[in-house]
From Swiss-Prot:
Coiled coil: none annotated. It comes from Yersinia pseudotuberculosis serotype IB (strain PB1/+). Belongs to the UPF0502 family. This is UPF0502 protein YPTS_2082. InterPro entries: DUF480 (IPR007432), WH-like_DNA-bd_sf (IPR036388), WH_DNA-bd_sf (IPR036390). Pfam families: DUF480 (PF04337). SUPFAM superfamilies: Winged helix' DNA-binding domain (SSF46785).
């Protein structure tokens, strides 16, 4: 089952995934440690300035979703994720997939080349081709898709990939498409309302939204089956 995260939840989960691999001696993490990780000035996009109360509120929501769990330390409460590869979780990812998903949660849409360079503390990709293969796998998994390929921006050599763990993905893509249309209209013939890049971007957004709706239908069907079983009992 694919999780639906808001921006703060994505940041917290991303930080837990990152620190579990890069600084295992500091994992599970305290509220203070998580707040510092969420607000890092490097390796984060956008840079956030979350208060401890905001991070705590996010942790409370994630606890209710069973995406993290808490444990009492010597002096403070500590938290670890149940986002993937946990004993009772549905999502299972390889180390390469975890690295890619973590960077996408922490920094948003990125190219395969950027991901290969930035994941080196979590996983050492042999080359860009291996990174692209990992992204392809994540986009085609039966329990996904977990990433979506965006239309290549004019003048760019590589397309960027975006994570599909947010309900706002489709609207973000469409907004980007509208911005592309505005720029194109200013530079080209005013009668042209869509560029090829914009059409491709809107198509990607619609495909992403359809995939999200399909997952929601599956989840609702499972819940309905559980209710019917309880009624039969």
């Amino acid at each position: 089952m694919k999780h639906n995260l808001n921006a703060h939840e994505a940041r917290v989960i991303g930080c837990l995934l990152e620190k579990q691999v890069t600084t295992p001696e500091q994992y599970p993490m305290s509220l203070n440690g998580l707040t510092l990780a969420c607000n890092q000035k490097t390796s984060r996009d956008p840079v956030m300035e979350l208060s401890e109360s905001q991070v705590q509120q996010t942790l409370d929501f994630l606890l209710k979703k069973h995406l993290i769990r808490s444990q009492s330390g010597n002096r403070v409460m500590k938290y670890e994720h149940r986002f993937c590869n946990s004993e009772f979780g549905d999502l299972k990812f390889s180390p390469a997939e975890v690295a890619v998903i973590t960077l996408l949660l922490l920094r948003g849409a990125q190219t395969p080349g950027e991901l290969r360079t930035r994941t080196n503390r979590m996983y050492e990709f042999a080359d860009v081709a291996e990174t692209e293969e990992t992204l392809k796998t994540l986009s085609l998994r039966e329990d996904g898709p977990f990433v979506v390929r965006l239309a290549r921006e004019p003048g760019k050599r590589e397309s960027r990939f975006m994570p599909l763990f947010s309900g706002d993905v489709a609207s973000s893509l469409l907004a980007a498409g509208e911005a592309e249309e505005d720029n194109h209209t200013l530079e080209a013939n005013p009668r042209e309302t869509h560029s090829f890049e914009n059409i491709a971007l809107e198509k990607t957004a619609l495909e992403a939204r359809v995939a999200q709706l399909e997952q929601q239908v599956i989840q609702l069907s499972r819940r309905l089956d559980d209710v019917l079983i309880q009624l039969d009992d």
